Amino acid sequence: MSSTKQEKYGYPRVSLYALMLAAAGIPLYIHLPRFASVELGIGLAALGSLLLALRVIDLVQDPLIGWAIDRFPKAQSLFAISAAAGLALGFPLLFSVTGQGGMLRLTVVLILLFSAYSLGMILLYARSATLAKSPTAPDLMRLAAWREGGMLTGVILAAMLPALLVGMGAAGEGYGAFGWALGGVAVVAAVISYPIWQRPVIKGDKPSLQGLAQAGALKLLLLALVNSLPVAITSTLFLFFVEDRLMLTGQAGPLLVLFFLSAGLSVPLWTRLANRVGGRQALLIAMPLAIGSFVGAAFLAPGQVMGFAVICLASGAALGADLVILPALFSVSLTNAGLNAALAFGVWSFAGKLALALAAFFVLPLLQAAGFQPGEANAPEALTMLTIAYAVVPCVLKLFALALVLTLPTKEAVA
């Protein structure tokens, strides 16, 4: 396949595969707390503990997945189809779980979903050099823009789909139909994206701690973990903050779409900026935007929908920079060092999921201890704790991430 055709037809297929995977990431953490508490009667503290416990599996599983992808490069088509099949089966099963034995069934299905998600994500990111037009910094950044654009489109669709399905006549809160719809998307994405997994794999050396450190990848891994925590916390608490703290009943869906739409539209802009001034400088521009958004959210009064809409636009734009620049910097560091990427991206994948699990593990029990009850009349103390968890804690974490960015080299490969 010529490089022109590869870019014309390959990047949209990459974007579609990313769209499929996105539904098992942030949207799952957005919908799962409400589904588990309302439909299954599972407490927030119990759910938070379960999600963190599942990360113990990832601690072993994700590096093993990365090792297998590096070890068996000719099996990448099988890996890609297996990941899609796991999602196609897991989504309908997840949202058909009922209260009878719900915790056990939920655990089993989440293991299936998270395993499929890990396999697909690690494969997609590890094959950046293979899927890009060329393994150079500008083309890796361009691939990242297509990939993250697909991710954000998937997040938007998955975030708003339950409400749309209810409007079309789906029963209850639309979760049953939601599961089947996502399963169908996985099947379609697997078929259409299949050709990209037929390309010869660009191989490198086996990564080691010393090699990762010399490439600057270990520092980027720490930055990725810390930087993922703020959005993990706000994603987990978004529905609660909008409906219970701001009292904007029925507005969570449109505001969530606005947030991720802003992120998606900002991706091409951050890509151009990073290629012009460097990834480090672009992040230093984006992160204060996120910090200002968290500060603004802390001072909003109930009913201030326009104020929160502005915050969604600003914080969404800042998220776009995080999503496109950090993975590209990591991929460039590995490629320049001549290292195989799959095992390294296995650790990268674990860091991102650990952030989501840590957010659920710490903030959900914290809210429950403060007496917060979703959808109920809450005491001022409970709502204050919700504000601290949603806005103040992420602000502090983002400041820490900003400090880590300042330690990056002033001249990196993405420039």
Language model regions located:
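Membrane-embedded alpha-helical bundles of multi-pass transporters/translocases
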Residues: S2-A415
